[in-house]
């Protein structure tokens, strides 16, 4: 399954917030997001994201790409995974046919097409790092 197909599958958000902020919110979310993406908060956020991915790496084979899937690094070492998180990251779990995307300009990561077991594991890993996993309306 390629990236385009996976991006069309059901997805969940791995986030600092437990659910989607209402659209009618008066802009506080964007002010909070801007603060979280600034130094020094962005380093703490990056560490949480990396922790989830490194722990997931202990359980699953991973492939990573920072060029929208043009090239893949199979079984990256932890340092490569850490460095890749500083770019637009595509993390493929080939044994699950699942994909995680992460962008340094976002406070969340997105998990596409997880099996029930993978979703349960990611929930546990994220919770341990103070993150939430929730599913937005699909469509």
Q: Which residues does each predicted region cover?
A:
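Structured alpha/beta or helical-core interaction and ligand-binding surfaces enriched in interleaved
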Residues: 1-109, 113-139
């Amino acid at each position: 399954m390629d990236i385009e197909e996976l991006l069309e599958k059901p997805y969940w958000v791995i986030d600092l917030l437990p659910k989607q902020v209402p659209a009618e919110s008066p802009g506080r979310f964007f002010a909070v997001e801007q603060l979280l993406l600034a130094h020094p908060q962005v380093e703490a956020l990056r560490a949480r994201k990396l922790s989830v991915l490194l722990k997931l790496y202990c359980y699953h084979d991973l492939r990573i790409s920072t060029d929208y899937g043009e090239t893949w690094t199979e079984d990256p070492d932890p340092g490569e995974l850490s460095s890749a998180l500083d770019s637009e990251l595509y993390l493929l779990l080939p044994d699950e046919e699942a994909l995680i995307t992460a962008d340094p300009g976002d406070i969340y990561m997105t998990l596409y097409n997880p099996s029930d077991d993978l979703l349960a594991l990611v929930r546990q890993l994220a919770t341990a790092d103070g993150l939430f996993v929730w599913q937005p309306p699909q469509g």
